[in-house]
Amino acid sequence: MQLKEIIENNAEVVSDQILRVDSFINHMIDPNVMMEIGEEFARRFRDDKITKVLTIEASGIAIGLTTALALRTPLLFAKKKVPSTLGDSYVSNIYSFTKNESVTVSVAKQYLKSDDKILIVDDFLARGEALKGLAHLVKQADAELVGVGIVIEKAFQGGGKALRDAGVRIESLIKVSSLEGGKLHLEE
């Protein structure tokens, strides 16, 4: 996969906690990279009979769409504001350390059912707060969380380990071991 080279050549280390990938993943999107990401997640979860891909707006939508296309299944994204038109919904609170704020996310109950087999996808996994919030939506619906696909896991922030220890299957395409000294260090 060319993703590793793209990240090594284009990602910007902002601090020892923050990696910026907005030139190809979460601001300006390279569709070829997104298709490759979606196809790789589909390959890893192809035999799991996924019925829906779940993500969070906005950064997860492109990743979710290409994954859903490759799996030939619907994409459902959690909304960060509960619109008045949403009706009966599952709701979860998520704290963002990057933005230093809490956000309420929601999914309409009519789109997340107890017989669903869910694959959650997102761009980053750091402390795991977004994933915990999305998993909480799945649990409220009594649906099955089959696994999680992450483009970039900041392994040094511990979210992935905690979720794996809790029994969640996580497939990360890239694992960052450190951003110390302004340098990107990847796990092999």
Swiss-Prot record:
Disulfides per UniProt: none
Tagged with keyword Cytoplasm: yes
GO BP terms: purine ribonucleoside salvage; xanthine metabolic process; XMP salvage
Enzyme class: transferase
Subcellular location: Cytoplasm
Keywords: Cytoplasm, Glycosyltransferase, Purine salvage, Transferase
Family note: Belongs to the purine/pyrimidine phosphoribosyltransferase family. Xpt subfamily.
Protein name: Xanthine phosphoribosyltransferase
Organism: Desulforamulus reducens (strain ATCC BAA-1160 / DSM 100696 / MI-1) (Desulfotomaculum reducens)
